[in-house]
Protein backbone atom coordinates (compact mmCIF):
# COMPACT_ATOMS: atom_id res chain seq x y z
CA UNK A 1 0.00 0.00 0.00
CA UNK A 2 1.46 3.36 -0.95
CA UNK A 3 1.45 6.44 1.27
CA UNK A 4 -1.43 8.07 -0.59
CA UNK A 5 -3.69 5.11 0.20
CA UNK A 6 -2.70 5.23 3.87
CA UNK A 7 -3.50 8.94 4.03
CA UNK A 8 -6.82 8.37 2.27
CA UNK A 9 -7.78 5.64 4.72
CA UNK A 10 -6.82 7.86 7.65
CA UNK A 11 -8.98 10.64 6.22
CA UNK A 12 -11.89 8.26 5.62
CA UNK A 13 -11.52 6.89 9.14
CA UNK A 14 -11.59 10.41 10.58
CA UNK A 15 -14.72 11.19 8.57
CA UNK A 16 -16.44 7.95 9.62
CA UNK A 17 -15.70 8.72 13.28
CA UNK A 18 -16.88 12.33 12.92
CA UNK A 19 -20.16 11.41 11.22
CA UNK A 20 -20.80 8.69 13.83
CA UNK A 21 -20.30 11.23 16.61
CA UNK A 22 -22.73 13.59 14.88
CA UNK A 23 -25.28 10.77 14.57
CA UNK A 24 -24.91 9.90 18.27
CA UNK A 25 -25.49 13.56 19.15
CA UNK A 26 -28.80 13.45 17.30
CA UNK A 27 -27.72 15.29 14.18
CA UNK A 28 -29.10 13.75 10.99
CA UNK A 29 -26.48 12.04 8.84
CA UNK A 30 -27.34 10.86 5.33
CA UNK A 31 -24.71 8.16 4.94
CA UNK A 32 -25.87 7.47 1.37
CA UNK A 33 -25.07 11.07 0.43
CA UNK A 34 -21.70 10.83 2.18
CA UNK A 35 -20.69 7.65 0.35
CA UNK A 36 -22.44 8.37 -2.95
CA UNK A 37 -19.30 9.07 -4.99
CA UNK A 38 -17.13 6.36 -3.43
CA UNK A 39 -16.30 3.20 -5.32
CA UNK A 40 -17.75 -0.01 -3.90
CA UNK A 41 -14.59 -1.07 -2.05
CA UNK A 42 -14.21 2.27 -0.24
CA UNK A 43 -17.96 2.54 0.42
CA UNK A 44 -18.02 -0.92 2.02
CA UNK A 45 -14.96 -0.13 4.18
CA UNK A 46 -16.33 3.29 5.16
CA UNK A 47 -19.77 1.95 6.10
CA UNK A 48 -18.25 -0.77 8.29
CA UNK A 49 -16.08 1.80 10.09
CA UNK A 50 -19.06 4.16 10.42
CA UNK A 51 -21.21 1.38 11.93
CA UNK A 52 -18.44 0.48 14.39
CA UNK A 53 -18.02 4.10 15.47
CA UNK A 54 -21.80 4.59 15.74
CA UNK A 55 -21.95 1.60 18.08
CA UNK A 56 -19.05 2.93 20.16
CA UNK A 57 -20.50 6.44 20.33
CA UNK A 58 -23.91 5.12 21.37
CA UNK A 59 -22.36 2.98 24.11
CA UNK A 60 -20.28 5.91 25.35
CA UNK A 61 -23.35 8.13 25.46
CA UNK A 62 -25.29 5.51 27.45
CA UNK A 63 -22.45 5.22 29.96
CA UNK A 64 -22.30 9.00 30.22
CA UNK A 65 -26.01 9.18 31.02
CA UNK A 66 -25.72 6.46 33.66
CA UNK A 67 -23.16 8.42 35.68
From Swiss-Prot:
GO terms for biological process: negative regulation of bacterial-type flagellum-dependent cell motility; negative regulation of single-species biofilm formation. InterPro entries: GlgS, GlgS_sf. Pfam families: GlgS. SUPFAM superfamilies: Glycogen synthesis protein GlgS. Belongs to the GlgS family. NCBIfam families: PRK02922.1. Major determinant of cell surface composition. Negatively regulates motility, adhesion and synthesis of biofilm exopolysaccharides. This is Surface composition regulator. It comes from Salmonella paratyphi A (strain AKU_12601). The lineage of its organism: Bacteria, Pseudomonadati, Pseudomonadota, Gammaproteobacteria, Enterobacterales. The gene is glgS.
Amino acid sequence: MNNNNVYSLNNFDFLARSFARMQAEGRPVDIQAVTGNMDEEHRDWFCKRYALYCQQATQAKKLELEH
